[in-house]
């Protein structure tokens, strides 16, 4: 199966491409800018994909340019779907990665796909708008939508929480500045997400939306303590008010029952590594990166 992958060089795109290739599929990374409809049309026509995994988009909630969320996450996706419907033979399946952020703040836990969306930031709003827009194509394309809950792994940008922690603990930094230590999130492994996406390309039901989650949330303070236990390093944590968002989602925990039941019908069970295993992999990668940087003379060390 030839898979057109957007965001192929991103945090999820790289391991997904490797996972799909290992399973015998051909993966072609999209080169065109999603906001350039003409270039996108040409490239999609050249690739003629059997399936599409759309991961490209702005994923950092605190991104400074609010308009960019909509330009890329909504209009860029519109351009992609518009190019796909013009193919003589449309792809068998199109997977669109949305986000659990569309649920917003809710007392419901775990959250099922049927829960009413109520996003509280531009990132979540742009993803929900993308979902609604995509549904206008369901009469012409087989589309599945995923709502991944928080996940992490080696290679994630240090703008995100867990990689930032891994870097600081690997460097045995004396302190770190964080936001609210009492928010609760799932911290799933990127490998699980990649496995789920490939499985949904093959077995997903068109028009359906699936949470990609574990149903196991952790308070941030617990994660900090686990890093300390894994490294034997006690680090002072400073709560920086600038990192505490006014519209913070306090608890985000998904219900995996719908996806698990779908895959079980095909004899598939997702492997969900423990948080300790995931953090261990990230510490190893961060330590390797630290050793590499130390081998370069004149590299400054900065901690924040």
Briefly describe each language-model feature range.
Residues 272-304:
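Amphipathic terminal alpha-helices
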Residues 3-21:
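N-terminal Rossmann NAD(P)H-binding glycine-rich loop of SDR-like oxidoreductase domains
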């Amino acid at each position: 199966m030839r898979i057109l992958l957007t965001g192929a060089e991103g945090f999820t795109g790289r391991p997904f491409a490797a996972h799909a290739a290992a399973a015998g599929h051909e993966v072609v990374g999209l080169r065109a800018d999603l906001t350039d409809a003409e270039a996108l049309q040409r490239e999609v026509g050249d690739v003629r994909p059997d399936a599409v995994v759309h991961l490209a988009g702005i994923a950092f909630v605190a991104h400074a340019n609010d308009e960019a969320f909509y330009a890329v996450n909504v209009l860029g996706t519109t351009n992609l779907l518009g190019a796909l419907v013009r193919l003589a033979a449309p792809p068998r399946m199109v997977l669109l990665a949305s986000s659990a952020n569309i649920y917003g703040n809710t007392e419901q836990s775990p959250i099922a796909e049927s829960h009413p969306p109520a996003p509280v930031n531009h990132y979540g709003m742009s993803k929900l708008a993308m979902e609604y827009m995509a549904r206008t194509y369901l009469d012409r394309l087989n589309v599945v939508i995923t709502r991944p809950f928080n996940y992490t792994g080696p290679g994630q940008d240090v703008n995100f929480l867990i990689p930032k922690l891994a870097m600081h603990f690997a460097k045995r930094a004396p302190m770190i500045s964080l936001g609210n230590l009492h928010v609760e999130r799932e911290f799933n492994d990127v490998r699980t997400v990649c496995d789920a996406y490939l499985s949904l390309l093959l077995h997903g039901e068109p028009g359906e939306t699936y949470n990609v989650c574990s149903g196991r949330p952790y308070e941030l303070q617990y994660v900090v303590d686990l890093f300390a236990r894994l490294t034997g390093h006690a680090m002072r944590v400073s709560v920086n008010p600038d990192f505490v968002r006014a519209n913070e989602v306090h608890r985000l925990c998904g219900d995996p029952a719908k996806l698990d039941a779908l895959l079980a019908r095909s004899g598939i069970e997702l492997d969900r590594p423990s948080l300790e295993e995931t953090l261990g992999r990230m510490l190893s990668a961060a330590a390797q990166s630290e050793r590499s940087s130390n081998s370069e003379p004149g590299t400054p060390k900065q901690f924040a």
